[in-house]
Amino acid sequence: SVGAGVIYGPSYRGSDDYVFSPIPVVQGNLGGVGISPRAGGIALDFIPDRDGEVSFSAGIAAKLSRNRAAQIKDPVVRSYGELETAIEVGPSAGVSVPALLNPYDSLSFNIDAVWDVAGAHNGMSVNPSITYFTPLSRGIAVSLSVSAKHIDDDFADYYYSVPAGGPLPEFQAEGGFESAGGNLLGVFDLDGDVTNGGLALIALGGYSRMLGDAKRTPFTSIRGDADQWMGAVG
């Protein structure tokens, strides 16, 4: 399945200003390779699954990070300049357990570990997540996800350190947990059958909380907000 939508979210990680951005959505199976969406990218699963059984996934995740690379609405943060776009690639693995509360639901555990290969932040992040999926009817399905993000020192320094000599206090950021939060996704199939891959409408809402130095940086604590909200339709 291929789709497109629009997301309304913070203008940068930790911002209290919100902007609209287009988003592509790709999910399905191509030549035996599973394709799952990720924030800003996709994950490929090279292990075939069997219906009705516990399944394992292993493959590659690839993400595009445009944090503070565009659409910075805050004039003080913008005065520190736009950052480079990061391309993050690394291994992805998970396990999915079906038929917990009904014959069609599932509980999935996934983890991605990705490194910047474009020379932007030159760091890495680890992203664990848990997702519960269930249909509400033949044409409507929902999923609830909780996730966290752990970053290394290079990642933290690039996005959250504040150099001396500017309008904000100097700050040296170090790695740790960057954020944790949850998303609720709803899918409404236009022909009443979510299993046949036809046209569908999606709605997504989410909340995350900035943690550690991502919360303490003046970009968040003075010019932004640790509480981050987002919504998307497509």
Where are these regions (language model features)?
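Short loop/turn motifs that connect adjacent beta-strands in outer-membrane beta-barrel proteins
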Residues: S1, G14, V33-F56, P98-S106, ...
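Glycine- and aromatic-enriched membrane insertion/assembly motifs of diderm outer-membrane
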Residues: Y18-Q71, E84-D112
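Structural signature of outer-membrane beta-barrel domains
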Residues: G9-S11, K63-N67, P98, V114-A118, ...
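Residues that define the transmembrane beta-barrel architecture of outer-membrane proteins
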Residues: Y18-P24, G52-V54, L83-V89, N122-V126, ...
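Residues on the lipid-exposed face of transmembrane beta-strands in outer-membrane beta-barrel proteins
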Residues: A4-Y8, P24-L30, I42-P48, I60, ...
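A contiguous pocket-lining binding segment that forms or flanks enzyme active sites
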Residues: N122-P169
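Predominantly the C-terminal beta-signal and adjacent terminal strand-loop region
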Residues: V187-G234
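Extracellular/periplasm-exposed beta-strand and loop segments of Gram-negative cell-envelope proteins
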Residues: A69, S79-E84, D116-A120, D153-P163, ...
